[in-house]
C-alpha cells in the first residue's frame, strides 16, 4: 500500500485523523498579480489534447505553480514526482505529484508544508483527497523528526480546472467545500488561494 491507495475511511481508521468539511479559506483573498507568461502558456494549452492527467499536469497545473513561484522567488521550492517515504508500516510511502517545501539550495526536502495531488479524473474525488491527507500526515511526521514542527500542513487536490483545499491541524483533516475554478481566460482564483495558503505556511 502507498499514498495513492488510501481511502477516506483509512484516514480515520489507520491514521486516527477525523475528516471534516468546513469553510476555512479566507473569502476575501487578495487578487493575484497578472502573469503574462502564464496567460501565454494557457493560450497554447487550449490547442493541446488535455484528456489525460499527464497532459493537464504539463499544460495547466505545472504552469500555475510556476506562476506562483515567480511571484515568490526564494520563498519555497517545488518538488515534482518526489518519492516521499516516511513510514512503510503505515503505508506512508510513494511518489507525490507536487510538494512545496521551505527553500533549499540542494535537492533534499527541508520542511514540506504543502502537497498538491492531481486527480485521475476530470473532477475532484475522495480518493485524491485521501491520498493528499495521507501525504500531509507524513509531512507532519517528517517535520517533527527534523525538529521543525508546523502548526498546520496544507494540501490541494486538483483536476486542473477545479482546485480543492485541505488542511491538517490539531490532528484533524479539514476540507474547504468551496472549490476554486480555473479557466483559460482566468486562472487566478486558485492562485489567489494558493498565495494565501503560502503566506500562512510561511508564518507557521
What are these model-derived regions, one by one?
Residues 157-164:
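Short, conserved secondary-structure transition motifs
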Residues 2-4, 11-23, 27-151, 167-204:
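A short, conserved, highly charged catalytic patch centered on acidic carboxylates
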